[in-house]
């Protein structure tokens, strides 16, 4: 997939989907034509944060043979959105061959999108890694907690050793300031490069903010909040 960004994390609960959604909208506000795909098949929730109620999902592609173009919804700022489907147990574990077929089927999106943002499942599953290895840029979301460090480390270990991925951008979420984000990143980077041939780049910090939490509750991305100037700059 060309011109594509995957947003990943070693564990759930670190704000991965929030960052993927707001990143997609920020890029669209900058004038790019953006598509957002929720690749957490069967357990998707990006549509909730977008305030979109999708009529179809990726299940219709995997199970019913519909082309990807037929399951696209239009979200805020005109972004194109592909839902991963929610509460659909029959697509929780997609076979590897089906994953590759799906990735190939996404290529037609290139004709009307400048960038594809993919929200991939948390953790180092085969599904996550298949998408991670197919995109141009891989963003890892990290928070300053030992469990997040360990799970992100495990994700990078698998991506690097099993899939040959070397370049990772790291976003540190829920920080008090940019200096704190830089410290957390440096500590994590030192732990990773000690053992793996990987390149980690600091992609910035996202502030801990009630406005972000309120936006989630309102089903409205924070970058669309006119009063959330600091939060907008972070994305």
Segments the model singles out, each with a brief description of its role:
Residues 149-163:
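Conserved C-terminal guanine-recognition region of P-loop GTPase G domains, centered on the G4
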Residues 28, 132, 160:
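Gly/Ala-rich phosphate-binding loop of Rossmann-like dinucleotide-binding domains
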Residues 10, 143, 168-182, 205-212:
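G-domain G4 guanine-recognition motif of GTPases
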Residues 37-111, 216-220:
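P-loop/Walker-type NTP enzyme "switch/lid" segment
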Residues 108-111, 125-147:
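Inter-motif core of Ras-like GTPase G domains
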């Amino acid at each position: 997939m060309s011109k594509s960004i995957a947003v990943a994390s070693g564990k759930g609960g670190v704000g991965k989907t929030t960052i993927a959604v707001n990143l997609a909208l920020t890029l669209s506000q900058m004038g790019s034509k953006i598509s957002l795909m929720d690749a957490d098949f069967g357990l998707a929730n990006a549509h909730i944060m977008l305030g979109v109620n999708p009529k179809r999902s990726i299940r219709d592609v995997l199970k019913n043979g519909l082309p990807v173009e037929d399951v696209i919804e239009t979200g805020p700022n005109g972004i194109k959105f592909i839902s991963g489907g929610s509460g659909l147990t029959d697509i929780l574990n997609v076979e590897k061959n089906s994953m590759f077929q799906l990735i190939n089927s996404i290529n037609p999106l290139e004709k009307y999108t400048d960038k594809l943002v993919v929200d991939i499942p948390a953790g180092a599953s085969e599904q996550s890694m298949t998408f991670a290895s197919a995109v141009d840029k891989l963003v890892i979301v990290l928070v300053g907690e030992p469990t997040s460090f360990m799970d992100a480390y495990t994700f990078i270990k698998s991506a690097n050793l099993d899939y040959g991925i070397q370049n990772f951008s790291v976003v540190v979420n829920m920080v008090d300031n940019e200096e704190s984000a830089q410290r957390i990143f440096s500590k994590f980077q030192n732990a990773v490069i000690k053992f793996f041939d990987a390149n980690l780049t600091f992609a910035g910090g996202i502030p801990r903010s009630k406005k972000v939490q309120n936006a989630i509750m309102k089903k409205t991305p924070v970058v669309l909040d006119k009063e959330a100037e600091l939060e907008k700059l972070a994305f």
